[in-house]
Swiss-Prot record:
Belongs to the universal ribosomal protein uS19 family. One of its GO terms (biological process) is ribosomal small subunit assembly. Pfam families: Ribosomal_S19 (PF00203). The keyword Translocase does not apply. Coiled coil: none annotated. One of its GO terms (molecular function) is rRNA binding. This is Small ribosomal subunit protein uS19. Keywords: Ribonucleoprotein, Ribosomal protein, RNA-binding, rRNA-binding. It comes from Chloroflexus aggregans (strain MD-66 / DSM 9485). Protein S19 forms a complex with S13 that binds strongly to the 16S ribosomal RNA. Signal peptide: none annotated. The lineage of its organism: Bacteria, Bacillati, Chloroflexota, Chloroflexia, Chloroflexales. GO terms for cellular component: cytoplasm; small ribosomal subunit. InterPro entries: Ribosomal_uS19 (IPR002222), Ribosomal_uS19_bac-type (IPR005732), Ribosomal_uS19_CS (IPR020934), Ribosomal_uS19_SF (IPR023575).
């Protein structure tokens, strides 16, 4: 179920304040955040935000197509390494 339309989109206030301050100063530097549930606003376009994935911060460059999505969508938390497949023989040769 999605968020109620009467509430409006959620964005972390501290993150939005940092973005607006950087826009006023006309500077571009990476912002580190743990707020994966924040919605991407048009003011964020052109900035790089380091989104935490549980282990490290993943750099996410915000483009126009990302507006309306959540920051966490662009920093995956689970990495699929593949299913079993053919196991190597003790001699090191696959048959």
């Amino acid at each position: 179920m999605s968020r109620s339309s009467k509430k409006g989109p959620y964005v972390d206030i501290k993150l939005l304040d940092k973005i607006e301050a950087m826009n006023k100063a006309n500077e571009k530097r990476a912002i580190r955040t743990w707020s994966r549930d924040s919605t991407i606003f048009p003011q964020m376009i052109g900035h790089t935000i380091l989104v935490h994935d549980g282990r490290r911060h993943v750099p996410v460059y915000i483009t126009e197509n990302m507006v309306g999505h959540k920051l966490g969508e662009f920093a995956p938390t689970r990495f699929f390494r593949g299913h079993g497949g053919k196991k190597a023989d003790k001699r090191g040769k696959v048959k």
